[in-house]
């Protein structure tokens, strides 16, 4: 190409290729027979003849679908909740674990009114039966609204899950946003279940005193 100054220059054409996220791309999108959209990861040693634990990750508010828009991807891209368990370090700790991240059609606050409790349980049963899952080692993790969902799943099926962990579980918000109140009587059903709660005392969104601290005091 000759420029106005009489000199010669060159230019190239760049075409954007596929954007690669090595962590997120380890997951595969699926939909259960019960109608739940989810992403799943299978450990590299899944075919070693052994049973492996299953980790369920419940996303927070704002990472579900919205009306007719269901992307089945926000729950793994919004934060490193699910993808962190697919890391080599985490996989080594668990000896190779399956990871499943379901996505609510809207919000987990509607877990009873829209039947998410039962449909998600059916999804877990289906996935576990189709893979080499150790049904004695199914763990729940959840953040914010997903923490609320984690509590409700554990309360409804206390003998099904081995343990659970929550980060700023939105028990207070759920009770006024379409969900149900988690009572002391509810919590007594899971009194002997292993639980690890993570919550900042100065959390400006989810009250530490009204949620994690209250649960700790009851249990």
Segments (PLM) and residue ranges:
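Short glycine-enriched nucleophile-adjacent loop
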Residues: 147-158
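Short, solvent-exposed loop/turn and secondary-structure capping segments
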Residues: 50-51, 65-73, 111-114, 152-153, ...
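The feature captures the conserved acid-bearing segment of alpha/beta-hydrolase catalytic domains
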Residues: 162-219
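Loop/turn elements at helix/coil->beta-strand transitions in domains of secreted/extracellular proteins
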Residues: 50-55, 94-98, 129, 134-139, ...
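Gly/Ser-rich "nucleophile elbow"/oxyanion-hole loop immediately N-terminal to the catalytic nucleophile
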Residues: 46-50, 108-144
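The conserved beta1-alpha1 loop
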Residues: 53, 58-60, 168, 199-200
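Active-site machinery of serine-nucleophile hydrolases
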Residues: 54, 58-119
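A domain-start/cap signature at the N-terminus of enzymes
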Residues: 1-53, 215
């Amino acid at each position: 190409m000759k420029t106005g100054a009489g000199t010669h220059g060159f230019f190239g054409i760049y075409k954007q290729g596929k954007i690669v996220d090595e962590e997120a791309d380890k997951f595969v999108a699926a939909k259960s027979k019960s109608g739940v959209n989810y992403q799943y990861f299978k450990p590299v040693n899944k075919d070693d003849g052994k049973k492996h634990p299953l980790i369920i990750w419940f996303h927070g508010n704002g990472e579900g679908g919205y009306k007719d828009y269901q992307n089945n991807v926000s729950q793994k891209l919004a934060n490193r909740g699910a993808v962190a368990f697919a890391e080599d370090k985490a996989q080594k700790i668990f000896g190779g674990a399956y990871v499943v991240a379901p996505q609510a059609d809207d919000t987990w606050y509607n877990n009873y009114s829209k039947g998410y409790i039962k449909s998600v349980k059916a999804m877990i049963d289906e996935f576990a039966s189709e893979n080499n899952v150790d049904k004695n080692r199914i763990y729940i993790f959840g953040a914010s609204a997903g923490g609320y969902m984690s509590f409700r799943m554990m309360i409804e099926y206390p003998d099904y899950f081995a343990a659970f962990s929550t980060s700023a579980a939105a028990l207070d918000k759920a009770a006024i946003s379409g969900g149900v109140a988690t009572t002391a009587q509810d919590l007594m059903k899971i009194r002997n279940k292993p639980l690890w709660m993570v919550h900042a005392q100065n959390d400006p969104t989810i009250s530490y005193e009204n949620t994690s601290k209250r649960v700790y005091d009851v249990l």
